[in-house]
């Protein structure tokens, strides 16, 4: 019986499961967003959120604990220097799981996207700024070509009637 046992087994041995989540955590912290099954995404939250909490502590022992999970000095440096400061003052909820509409074609597994909440906001703001500049440039240019086209059509119709 499964009394008081937390977490999903995902049809894997414990070592396979821990390796899976370690690799997925590395990918999520590297890319900021990954696409996976719903169950894996929900379980991955339990691995990544404590890592970000460690990054908020920002001391030597926290770095060593993060290295124990991630196994990469570069990724630990990124976690503590880039990702951690974006979540200062946030009391949890560092990741977001968005369910995708279409299941995976091969086995019909429900899919989801897991992403870091603050990194997505920063990327969206960076994308919106250039988009606004382009919109302003388009608004500044007058539409000169619309009027001549109508005049050309009328002239063509007059020529066809004559």
From Swiss-Prot:
<dbReference type="InterPro" id="IPR000456">
    <property type="entry name" value="Ribosomal_bL17"/>
</dbReference>
<keyword id="KW-0689">Ribosomal protein</keyword>
<comment type="subunit">
    <text>Part of the 50S ribosomal subunit. Contacts protein L32.</text>
</comment>
<dbReference type="GO" id="GO:0003735">
    <property type="term" value="F:structural constituent of ribosome"/>
</dbReference>
<comment type="similarity">
    <text>Belongs to the bacterial ribosomal protein bL17 family.</text>
</comment>
<keyword id="KW-0687">Ribonucleoprotein</keyword>
<protein>
    <recommendedName>
        <fullName>Large ribosomal subunit protein bL17</fullName>
    </recommendedName>
</protein>
<dbReference type="GO" id="GO:0006412">
    <property type="term" value="P:translation"/>
</dbReference>
<feature type="region of interest" description="Disordered">
    <location>
        <begin position="125"/>
        <end position="162"/>
    </location>
</feature>
<feature type="compositionally biased region" description="Basic and acidic residues">
    <location>
        <begin position="125"/>
        <end position="140"/>
    </location>
</feature>
<dbReference type="GO" id="GO:0022625">
    <property type="term" value="C:cytosolic large ribosomal subunit"/>
</dbReference>
<dbReference type="InterPro" id="IPR036373">
    <property type="entry name" value="Ribosomal_bL17_sf"/>
</dbReference>
<dbReference type="Pfam" id="PF01196">
    <property type="entry name" value="Ribosomal_L17"/>
</dbReference>
